[in-house]
Amino acid sequence: MNQSPSLIEQGISQQHLKTLSCANVLTLAYQSLGVIYGDLSTSPLYVYKTTFSGKLSLHEDDEEIFGVFSFIFWTFTLIALFKYVFIVLSADDNGEGGTFALYSLLCRYAKLSILPNHQEMDEKLSTYATGSPGETRQSAAVKSFFEKHPKSQKCLLLFVLLGTCMAIGDSVLTPTISVLSAVSGVKLKIPNLHENYVVIIACIILVAIFSVQRYGTHRVAFIFAPISTAWLLSISSIGVYNTIKWNPRIVSALSPVYMYKFLRSTGVEGWVSLGGVVLSITGVETMFADLGHFSSLSIKVAFSFFVYPCLILAYMGEAAFLSKHHEDIQQSFYKAIPEPVFWPVFIVATFAAVVGSQAVISATFSIISQCCALDCFPRVKIIHTSSKIHGQIYIPEVNWMLMCLCLAVTIGLRDTNMMGHAYGLAVTSVMLVTTCLMTLVMTIVWKQRIITVLAFVVFFGSIELLYFSSCVYKVPEGGWIPILLSLTFMAVMYIWNYGTTKKHEFDVENKVSMDRIVSLGPSIGMVRVPGIGLVYSNLVTGVPAVFGHFVTNLPAFHKILVFVCVKSVQVPYVGEEERFVISRVGPKEYGMFRSVVRYGYRDVPREMYDFESRLVSAIVEFVETEPGLEEEEMSSVRRKKEECMEIMEAKEAGVAYILGHSYAKAKQSSSVLKKLAVNVVFAFMSTNCRGTDVVLNVPHTSLLEVGMVYYV
């Protein structure tokens, strides 16, 4: 079955997918296997190996193996199936999922906007709906807390960014551990192959994966679902074979009693080993994050009726094999494969690792794009890799950065056990962030009773804290990697957000007053030249300081002036009919307008987007529908037509883009830490990141930059 581009586009660009036919749901469910479940399905490659990598030993009674499988089964059932499939997938934001979707819901319902240019008119967007106005005592109390303590809003943002940074850490560790685990199976057939060659092969595959990203996944995505399907069917069939051949009694380990027996007999070592068990649910967060690419029902169908049983059978079969082959624990996955099908399964495993890596890389591009929309990451070039499928993007800087980090981890560690320890900490951290945000969503958005909310957070939170504590114990053995990565990204995000916020505050404090503009008269104190001048700023009201700086140094300006503010709003997408908000600046004879251009946090301006024509059309429509005096209706209509003609003639004369090239500097009275953050770190990022003109796709032939210094 081939993937249908029209269905994928529908899955990505439309939020109301509940009316899909049964055939369409099944088609989307099949497609999701190659996009969502690549990471989750490759976990059997390293779960048992990592779990038994410490001091946990095997005894003849097999109580440890039965206990570990019991933990895997119930963790998979409670966290992946009950929490994510049955509960978390319901917390969508207009069909979109992920950490930012939860945060967006909270911001809208609790009015926690951290965007400095938020306007009341944004709340009238069709996707901004906040449901019924009714409040419960709990939801009102939480909202009141955030209103009375503004710093708590910043803390919530930092908490969300923490989860985001850990997710980025996942994107470094997933390709590394998946590819290296898959390739290491070759040593079983070629025992004399040196470990260095295995690492080199893994590095070559990783370089190949990142090198083809610029071409877009849509060119090869049609084979992703068949690969994942073949992989899941292979490992589940082998699992059934091993269960029947080696130890059918493993079925009894489905009882939770074996978890208790395991912890009782192994003690501290058993608790420490749980950091390996949690790797069985790596990738469950992807189900929620990629919700906007498919439908909630299709993801639930794919997981509940195919992915879940296939993986449980695979883990069961490997446990049955291990119960009779204690000495093969460090190569249990490949040792459990029957000899006649070893090489076919090895090849499929390698391709499955590539598919799993591709899924998290694409998800990282989406995460970084959303961070940029919230002013929480330096400007990067975002490229659409498909003209048909919305949401498939490529970010060159992030791609090569991830490749370098993956290669560094692969070459530096060379040990999938240490990688597993690092991976576990990243996974449990993201899950805990989701649980905490879901608790707030259940209180503020869903308005659930306090007993329901407490039951959710206590039950799932305690399970995840158990695994988290186990992973924290292994920080010296590889767990430091995601901590280092997340702290680095957190510092970058926070400093960038701090710097841009301070620059906006400077803009607000130093904007040019309308009295000054009006005092200049109709000519605005200068020669008006043909054409349209687009003055970009972050202000939604007032005249930006960059304009005052410009008119002070240049005695000419365009006949039509448009102050353009491109901003993000706390919804995933903004419809084209709602994108432009046009208003006048000053009297009509001045020919000055303001255009607020709104994008959702998942919207990305396309390279071929005809911005000029759409903007001019929006201005003309505004002029035509602008209310006038009834007694002068005829003359008003004539003046409107004349003004529209002037605007169109100005467009034909040419459009110039005026952007401020700003330099932020800390005030002399600032602390040493602030000077370091602003004058050194923020300045370095501003200098080396993409320019505003690149991000906004401004044509270089029409660009005019005005230098300004911001003292923050």
From Swiss-Prot:
Q: Which residues lie on this side of the membrane: Cytoplasmic?
A: 1-19, 89-154, 211-219, 289-300, 362-392, 446-449, 496-712
The way this protein sits in the membrane is described as:
Multi-pass membrane protein
Q: Which residues cross the membrane?
A: 20-40, 68-88, 155-175, 190-210, 220-240, 268-288, 301-321, 341-361, 393-413, 425-445, 450-470, 475-495
One Pfam family matching this protein: K_trans_C
A Gene Ontology molecular function term of the record: potassium ion transmembrane transporter activity
- Classify the source by domain of life: Eukaryota
The text of the family note is: Belongs to the HAK/KUP transporter (TC 2.A.72.3) family.
UniProt miscellaneous comment: Low-affinity activity is strongly inhibited by barium or cesium.
Known role: High-affinity potassium transporter that could play a major role in the uptake of potassium from the rhizosphere. May act as a low-affinity potassium transporter under high potassium concentrations. Could also transport rubidium.
What is this protein called in UniProt? Potassium transporter 1
